[in-house]
Structure formats: structure tokens, C-alpha cells
Design a protein with these regions (language model features):
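Alpha-helix N-cap/helix-start motif at helix boundaries, enriched for small hydrophobics
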Residues: 60, 115, 177-178, 185, ...
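Catalytic-site neighborhood detector that most strongly recognizes the C-terminal catalytic loop/helix
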Residues: 148, 300-322
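Basic, Lys/Arg- and aromatic-enriched nucleic-acid-binding interface segment
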Residues: 156-188
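Short basic/aromatic active-site micro-motif
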Residues: 172-173, 253, 270-290, 300, ...
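Conserved tyrosine-mediated DNA breakage-rejoining catalytic core shared by Y-recombinases
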Residues: 193-231
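Active-site/catalytic core of tyrosine-dependent DNA strand-transfer enzymes
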Residues: 226-270, 282
């Protein structure tokens, strides 16, 4: 294997490994729902919409609870077409200061997101002519920017793990793992579920990774991601060394975390390296290299809701120093 074969980010190909295609459920229009329908009826149909779109269980439960609270305040029989911006603002004020129950900034932000997503769905479905939640100002709770690897740390990590390919006792796993996450930005859980048949080597110079989910409700997160030409020879060496059968990584997730810790030590990176750190590093590098925002969202397998909070952080990390 040559250095050219193992190049992780080939020159002249910004954003390589970014196919990020995502399968989406077919949209279904709410049956028999009009602007005169009750809020309760709309909420019931919105539940089905969330399931079809692959919202996570936690998101579905949280949104349903938020809408129940809103329905209790404004009236479940209220016609959805009669709900205006002033009604939403009064609800938010009541929830924050007059309800008598503590409402943290994070909870407040989520409930506003619930209203925005709910009414945006009604407008997109042509049930309402305008969105009363659109003018609401979203106040995201301040959270620290995630830690990413600097360019010199990325280079050191790649170099040190690549050297293990030719060590007296060769080990392809560290380099395969590091390069895979830096190229694709997949989650730890997704990494653990990769099976050999999920990687298409029809074109060895442009292999493709398919991210699959057994749960049909997660189908919106399924996607195909391009891998660089250097992935093929490293994967072949890894297969010879580890002989995976059922899954590509047939160890525990904790074991792979140890692999990253050892790799960070070899690279001289203090504080270690985590899956999440590599995922954020991938996202920032792709955005900095000109990948369109929505393509990056699809590549990371994020919903539009999660993206509202994630994109500003990526933009702040990718922009030049002041």
C-alpha cells in the first residue's frame, strides 16, 4: 500500500465521502383535516406523521407531552385555524412565569420547537394558510461548543495509526476505525452495527457504506456514504487479521473506545479521542470544505429538528478566527 492509496482526504476533492443519500418515508396528507378541525384532531394525526417520519421515541413522547400541555391551556376543541401568534406567545409566557411549575431554558426551547414543528406541518400539508409559530423567536439554551480535533491532531492521529499497518505486529483496526469515522461521521452505535455486506466494493476505488436500521421507524436515518480509495486495501488487511463474520467490529463498543484512547496516546493527543469528537471533526471539516448544509445534515443522519441546534455550532467551529 502506498501513501497515495491511504490518503484520507484526497486533494482536489473537498467533502469526499459525502454522498449522504437518505431514504425518506412517503409523505401522507392528513385525511379530513381542515382549518376548522379541532386541535385534538390535529394532534392525533400529527402523532402518525411523527411515526412515519422516523422521529425518535424520546422526541415523539416529548412532543406529545408538550402538545397535551398546549391543548390543556388553549382548549382541545379550539379550531386550529383560529390559533394565532398572540395565543402562542400567551401560552409561552404562562408556561415560563405564570404556571407555577419550573420551566428550564432547555424545556422552554423544546416546547417552542414542538409548536414550530407542529404548525409548520399543518402549513406544509396545506391545512393552514399561514404559520402562527413562524415569527416566534427561538431562544436556544447556551451549551458549550463540542471539542474537535485540530488539523495537526488529525494528521498526527492518521499518521500514527497508519504506521501500525506496517508494524512488526501489524494492526489495521486503529487506522480503519479512525479513518472510517473521520470520513463518514457515523455514530458509535451505527459503527457497531456495520456488517460486511453493508459495504459495496463494486468499485474498489470508490467503495460505498450503507447505514442500515432494523427498526422501520429509523428508516429516515438510513443512508449511503462514499469512502475514499484508501479504504479498500486497509479493510482487506483488517479482514485478514480479524476475520469478521457477523459484524465488521465484533468486539464491544467499550473495546473500540480503548482503541481510540490508545491511538490518541500514540498521536500525543492529550485528553484522548472519542467517537463523538471524531464525528464533530468530520462535520466541521466537511462544512469548511464547502459541503452544502442540507447534504451534511443527511450525511450525519440528523433530523431537521436536531439540525437547528447542530448547524450553528458547526458554523461557529468552521469559521475563521476573529
Amino acid at each position: 500500500m502506498t501513501d497515495e492509496q491511504l490518503a484520507l482526504f484526497p486533494k482536489g476533492k473537498p467533502g469526499r465521502g459525502s454522498a449522504g443519500e437518505m431514504t425518506r418515508p412517503v409523505a401522507t396528507l392528513p385525511a379530513n383535516l381542515t382549518s376548522n378541525s379541532s386541535l385534538a384532531a390535529a394532534i392525533a394525526l400529527f402523532y402518525g406523521h411523527m411515526i412515519r417520519q422516523g422521529f425518535s421515541d424520546n422526541t415523539v413522547k416529548a412532543f406529545q407531552a408538550d402538545l397535551r400541555l398546549f391543548s390543556k391551556y388553549i382548549g382541545s376543541n379550539r379550531a386550529i385555524g383560529s390559533i394565532g401568534q398572540a395565543d402562542l406567545e400567551e401560552f409561552l409566557t404562562w408556561m415560563r412565569s405564570a404556571r407555577g411549575v419550573p420551566c428550564s431554558p432547555k424545556t422552554y426551547a423544546r416546547r417552542m420547537t414542538t409548536l414550530k414543528v407542529f404548525f409548520a406541518w399543518l402549513v406544509e400539508s396545506e391545512i393552514l394558510p399561514f404559520d402562527p409559530a413562524a415569527p416566534l423567536i427561538h431562544e436556544h439554551p447556551s451549551t458549550p461548543l463540542p471539542m474537535i480535533l485540530y488539523d495537526d491532531q488529525v494528521n498526527a492521529l492518521i499518521r500514527s495509526t497508519r504506521d501500525l499497518l506496517w508494524a512488526p505486529k501489524p494492526d489495521a483496526r486503529p487506522y480503519l476505525l479512525v479513518s472510517l469515522i473521520l470520513q463518514t461521521g457515523i455514530k458509535k452505535s451505527e459503527c457497531m452495527e456495520i456488517r460486511p455486506e453493508h459495504i459495496d466494493f463494486s468499485n474498489p476505488q470508490a467503495p460505498v457504506l450503507y447505514i442500515r436500521y432494523a427498526d422501520a421507524r429509523r428508516s429516515s436515518k438510513e443512508r449511503k456514504l462514499a469512502l475514499g480509495p484508501g479504504f479498500t486495501p486497509v479493510y482487506q488487511q483488517y479482514v485478514r487479521e480479524y476475520k469478521p463474520r457477523d459484524r465488521v467490529f465484533e468486539c464491544t463498543a467499550r473495546n473500540l473506545e480503548y482503541v481510540l484512547e490508545d491511538a490518541a496516546h500514540l498521536a500525543g493527543i492529550e485528553g484522548g479521542v472519542s467517537f463523538e469528537q471524531l464525528r464533530w471533526t468530520c462535520a466541521v471539516r466537511d462544512y469548511r470544505n464547502g459541503m452544502p448544509a442540507d447534504q451534511l445534515r443527511q450525511k450525519l443522519g440528523l433530523s431537521h429538528i436536531s439540525w437547528r441546534e447542530t448547524l450553528p455550532k458547526i458554523q461557529r467551529l468552521a469559521r475563521p478566527a476573529l
